[in-house]
Structure formats: C-alpha cells, structure tokens
UniProtKB/Swiss-Prot annotation:
Organism from which the protein derives: Nitrosopumilus maritimus (strain SCM1)
Biological processes annotated in GO: translation
GO function terms (MF aspect): structural constituent of ribosome
Biased composition (Acidic residues): 114-127
Keyword Nucleotide-binding (UniProt): no
Basic and acidic residues: compositionally biased ranges: 128-137
PANTHER family reported in the protein's UniProt record: 40S RIBOSOMAL PROTEIN S6
GO CC term, one of those recorded: ribosome
Protein name: Small ribosomal subunit protein eS6
Sequence similarity: Belongs to the eukaryotic ribosomal protein eS6 family.
Sorted UniProt keywords: Ribonucleoprotein, Ribosomal protein
Region (Disordered): 114-137
Disulphide bridges, residue numbers: none
C-alpha cells in the first residue's frame, strides 16, 4: 500500500501539501520525474508535473538514475549535493526517477493557481486573555 505526501507548487510561488493513501495514490505509481499527470488525483483541475521527491529514509530522487532502485552515484554537482568545492566528487546514495511504494514525498508543479484556503480562526489568544482576567479578579 502506497502512502504519499505530495507538495504542490503553482506558478505564483504558493504551495500546499496533500496526503494520499492506498487506492488514491495508485495512479502515481510508475510515473517518472518530468512526466505530467492529471491533477484530479489531488482534487484540482489541470496538470501536475513531477519535479522531485524522496523516500522514507530521506534519500532524494534524481532524474538521471533510471528505475526505482537506490544506488550509490559519484556526484560533482546537482540534486543531492551541496557546497562541493571545484573538482570535488562525492559518492552518495540516490533514488531512481520512478515513483514506487518506497517513495514518501513527491514534489509537483501545478500549471494553474492553487485555490486560496482561509486560515481557521484562532481561538487560543482569546482564551488566554480570559484566563488572565479571571486571575485579576
């Protein structure tokens, strides 16, 4: 059974997260990074483009590794390598570009604008003020 946490970003820079479980997550299995899919999977109208992700242990997906396997790759720049000096190469563990059941987080681009969700009213500050008034009396 696949469980995915999907982070969706739109062209304006806004993002949102959705949790997909079991049969809702099945349409994403087997897709590769860079492919587009229908956004109705997450309840939106439009297209989603897969841009990245990571597995349950935090190993990032990399576009140039084919399949869903984990491999040690010699890197000099790119995804999964930060602050490499000039000429330095590092062997790191990376995940392939195919979505499988071991993937936990998937990053996507949405071709339209995400719907604006209003933040719930905060009741906590009001209740704190009431408590302080009760103590003064």
């Amino acid at each position: 059974m696949a469980n995915f946490k999907i982070t969706i970003s739109d062209t304006k820079g806004k993002s949102m997260s959705k949790e997909l479980k079991d049969s809702d997550a099945n349409p994403l299995l087997g897709l590769e990074l860079g492919q587009e899919t229908d956004a109705s999977v997450v309840g939106l109208n439009g297209k989603l483009k897969l841009t990245g992700g990571s597995d349950k242990s935090g190993v990032p997906m990399r576009n140039d590794i084919h399949g869903a396997a984990r491999k040690y790759v010699l890197l000099s720049k790119g995804v999964g390598l930060q602050d490499a000096e000039k000429g330095q190469r590092v062997r790191k563990l990376m995940r392939g570009n195919t979505v499988s059941e071991e993937i936990y987080q998937i990053n996507c681009k949405f071709d339209g604008e995400l719907p604006v969700e209003e933040a719930p009213a905060e009741d906590a500050p009001e209740s704190a003020e009431e408590k302080s008034e009760d103590k003064k009396e």
